Every structure is written in structure tokens, then in C-alpha cells.
Amino acid sequence: MSWTKKRERLHEAAVSTIRAISNNKKISSNTGLSQRPPTSDHVALPNVPRSFKDLNKWRGESDFQAFWHLFHKKSKDFQLTLPARMIFNELEIARVELLGSSKYLGSARNISEYTLSLIHISEPTRPST
């Protein structure tokens, strides 16, 4: 099987996993830039990475989207300034990631690697004892 076919299968598996975790079979998907937070009943996943070392980062994004669809609760729309809305969204993203990571333990590493890649940190540092 060619690497291209394997990458397509990984994408399909990620979308199936998102549907299963979120208990939402209606979720549609495409390949492209992820939206944070995602839109309702849709996920956009970046292309599967060519390098195995980047696979956990990629999985972290799909884990986040699954957790968003599982744990995010639609609240009443209330008026917020743009900076306040951005902070509110980031707090909600952190909340669903924490809830998901506590339920699905393997996803914590994936989400950590993805988050660190967003701020361009390649390896988590550990405090010395």
C-alpha cells in the first residue's frame, strides 16, 4: 500500500474516531486548516504529516476537535468585546481539552505536543529536581 493511501486511511480513521468519541455520526470533514473553535457538526483536519515524528501533533488536533464536540455546551450568546470573546474561546478550548484528556489519557500527550507546536516549542521541558 502506498504512503498516500496510508495517509488517506489515517485521515478516515481520525474522522471516525472523532465521530465515535463525540457521539455524533453527523460530523462531516474536510482536509484543511483547523478552526479553533470548530463549527457545528464539521471538522477540518490538516493533511496527515509525512513524518512519523509529527503524528502525535496531528492527532492532538483531531483529539481536540472530538473533545470540543463532546464537551462543549452551547451557551447563550452574550455581548463581549473581541478581546473578551477571544479569551472566552481560549478558556473554553482549555476546558474541553482538560475534560477530554482526563477521560482519554492517551490524548493528553497528543494535545500537549500540538499546543507546544503552536507556540513553536519542540520539546516540553521538565523541571529539574
Where are the model-predicted features located?
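Basic/hydrophobic alpha-helical interface regions
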Residues: 1-118, 122, 126
